């Protein structure tokens, strides 16, 4: 009985110790999981309060990490402390900013703001073991600032366009649209003032370590949410031209840059032309035309084309780059005298002579009969013609008239036949139009010319000629 009572007393004492330990643990304000949740909510509340006031300072002081790049969408985080409205995938890399480190001793992954901007309210309640971590976290801010290097992440922008939309991440999408709308209004106002003053949007001087402040450079920095830093070699100029923004899609912008070709032989290279091309969000196909002016000299290397924008479109981006046409200058046509000629008319002396087809000469029509009399060199086709010509030199007249009482002689037979017609009165050459007859063929030919010319004359001249023919016989009769 005594042993049983002792065992009951020991069991009751063990139960009391367990209850006291549970009461002590229950008296603690929060456990580790609840403490990490409170820290995450407190960090989000601090971010929403100090985000807008320290926006520019945050952009300047945030370091570059390989986890995420510094595009303009990194700075547009949700401004509400409610953790239930933000999905978990929007707070994990590559969606979370690069310098938001997870706090130690917490099982929940939550972005922590940079300690240089604010101090959390739970620093006094944290154990002393976390203090060295905070001191190490503050130490990188005292180091010299790293040079700016900014790029474009295809993975981030593609995932943002597909995952973080109004349904999945409404707070982030609303803040992005609101901030980009304000930046677009400032950009259009600055572009209008720049076009009025005929000042380029940005001028990059590669030889200076820090660009001097100017109105054009300040306007370019205010226009974009995140400035673009290009590594431009020496002796090059960057000229930005902004096209007319599309009224339907003021959110998305893009920069079209054509880099210059490599210059050889001391020739200054072509300028780098950047043009702002608006991209509509609803179109599945985006076509971009790269304007290029004909260079004075043919380029040796084809110039590459770079496409950059705030967000990569979902559709296909096509680059239509015109090929440079090299026109060989033609030398001006100069005549042998030294005068310039028009390229329309052919130059005299330079036109190729057309191959003329020479007709084959008949061997019977060659003037092979040459007169051998000194001082004469006439040629004839026939030997009979040469004999008749030689008679003119010798004076020989073998053909004599047989008419009674006529003793005339002739060197040629045709002359004798013509002379005989004068005795007989024969006129064997008749005109087919007026029936007039002639003794000689040459007389008929001369008469036929009158008929041909009469057809061309007007009627009044024909009448005058007829009157003259009528008036001539009385005059001749009176003269006789």
UniProtKB/Swiss-Prot annotation:
Its GO CC terms are: nucleus
Q: Which SMART domains match?
A: ZnF_C2H2 (SM00355)
Q: Which residues carry this modification: Phosphoserine?
A: 183, 249
Coarse class of the primary localization is: nucleus
Which Gene3D superfamilies does the annotation name?
Answer: Classic Zinc Finger (3.30.160.60)
- Renumbered to this chain, the Basic and acidic residues biased-composition regions fall at 14-32
Start and end residues, zinc fingers (C2H2-type)? 369-393, 399-423, 429-451
List this protein's GO terms for biological process.
bone mineralization; cellular response to endothelin; cellular response to starvation; circadian rhythm; negative regulation of DNA-templated transcription; positive regulation of osteoclast differentiation; positive regulation of transcription by RNA polymerase II; regulation of circadian rhythm
One Pfam family per UniProt: zf-C2H2
Alphabetical keyword list: Biological rhythms, DNA-binding, Metal-binding, Nucleus, Phosphoprotein, Repeat, Repressor, Transcription, Transcription regulation, Ubl conjugation, Zinc, Zinc-finger
Q: What is its induction?
A: Up-regulated in response to glucose.
Gene coding for it: Klf10
Biased amino acid composition, Polar residues: 1-12
CDD domains tied to this protein: KLF10_N
Q: Where is this region: Disordered?
A: 1-32, 64-83, 97-146, 202-222
Q: Where does the protein end up?
A: Nucleus
Q: What is the official name of this protein in its record?
A: Krueppel-like factor 10
Coiled-coil region(s) at which residues? none
> Annotated Gene Ontology MF terms?
core promoter sequence-specific DNA binding; DNA-binding transcription activator activity, RNA polymerase II-specific; DNA-binding transcription factor activity, RNA polymerase II-specific; RNA polymerase II cis-regulatory region sequence-specific DNA binding; sequence-specific double-stranded DNA binding; zinc ion binding
Q: State the source organism's domain of life.
A: Eukaryota
- Similarity comment: family membership: Belongs to the Sp1 C2H2-type zinc-finger protein family.
* Function text: Transcriptional repressor which binds to the consensus sequence 5'-GGTGTG-3'. Regulates the circadian expression of genes involved in lipogenesis, gluconeogenesis, and glycolysis in the liver. Represses the expression of PCK2, a rate-limiting step enzyme of gluconeogenesis. May play a role in the cell cycle regulation. Plays a role in the regulation of the circadian clock; binds to the GC box sequence in the promoter of the core clock component ARTNL/BMAL1 and represses its transcriptional activity.
Q: What does UniProt say on post-translational modification here?
A: Ubiquitinated; mediated by SIAH1 and leading to its subsequent proteasomal degradation.
């Amino acid at each position: 009985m005594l042993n049983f009572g002792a065992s009951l007393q020991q069991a009751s004492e063990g139960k009391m110790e367990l209850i006291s330990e549970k009461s002590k643990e229950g008296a603690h304000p929060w456990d580790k999981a609840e403490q990490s949740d409170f820290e995450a909510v407190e960090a989000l509340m601090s971010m929403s309060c100090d985000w807008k006031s320290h926006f520019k300072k945050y952009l300047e002081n945030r370091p570059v990490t390989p986890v995420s790049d510094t595009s303009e969408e990194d700075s547009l985080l949700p401004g509400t402390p409610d953790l239930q409205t933000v999905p978990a995938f929007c707070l994990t890399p590559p969606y979370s900013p690069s310098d938001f480190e997870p706090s130690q001793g917490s099982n929940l992954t939550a972005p922590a703001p940079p300690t240089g901007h604010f101090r959390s309210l739970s620093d006094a309640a944290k154990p002393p073991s976390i203090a060295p971590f905070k001191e190490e976290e503050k130490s990188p801010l005292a180091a010299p600032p790293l040079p700016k290097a900014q790029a474009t992440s295809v993975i981030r922008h593609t995932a943002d366009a597909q995952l973080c939309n109004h349904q999945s991440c409404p707070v982030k999408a609303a803040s992005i649209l609101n901030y980009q709308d304000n930046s677009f209004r400032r950009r259009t106002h600055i572009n209008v003032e720049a076009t009025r003053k005929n000042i380029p949007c940005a001028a990059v001087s590669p030889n200076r370590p820090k660009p001097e402040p100017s109105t054009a450079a300040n306007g370019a920095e205010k226009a974009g949410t995140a400035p673009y830093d290009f590594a431009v070699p020496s002796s090059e100029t960057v000229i930005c031209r902004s096209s007319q923004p599309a009224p339907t899609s003021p959110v998305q912008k893009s920069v079209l840059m054509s880099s210059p070709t490599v210059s050889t032989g001391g020739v200054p290279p072509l300028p780098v032309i950047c043009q702002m091309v608006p991209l509509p969000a609803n179109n599945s196909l985006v076509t971009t035309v790269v304007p290029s002016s004909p260079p004075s000299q043919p380029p040796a290397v084809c110039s590459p084309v770079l496409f950059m924008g705030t967000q990569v479109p979902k559709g296909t981006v096509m680059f239509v780059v015109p090929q440079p046409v090299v026109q060989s200058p033609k030398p001006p046509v100069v005549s042998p005298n030294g005068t310039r000629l028009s390229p329309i008319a052919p130059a005299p002396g330079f036109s190729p002579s057309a191959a003329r087809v020479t007709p084959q000469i008949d061997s019977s029509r060659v003037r092979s009969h040459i007169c051998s009399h000194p001082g004469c060199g006439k040629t004839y086709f026939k030997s009979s013609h040469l004999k008749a010509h030689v008679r003119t030199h010798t004076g020989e007249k073998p053909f004599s008239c047989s008419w009674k009482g006529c003793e005339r002689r002739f060197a040629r037979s045709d002359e004798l036949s013509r002379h005989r017609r004068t005795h007989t009165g024969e006129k064997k050459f008749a005109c087919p139009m007026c029936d007039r007859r002639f003794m000689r063929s040459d007389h008929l030919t001369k008469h036929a010319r009158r008929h041909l010319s009469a057809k061309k004359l007007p009627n009044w001249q024909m009448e005058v000629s007829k009157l003259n023919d009528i008036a001539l016989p009385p005059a001749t009769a009176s003269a006789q």
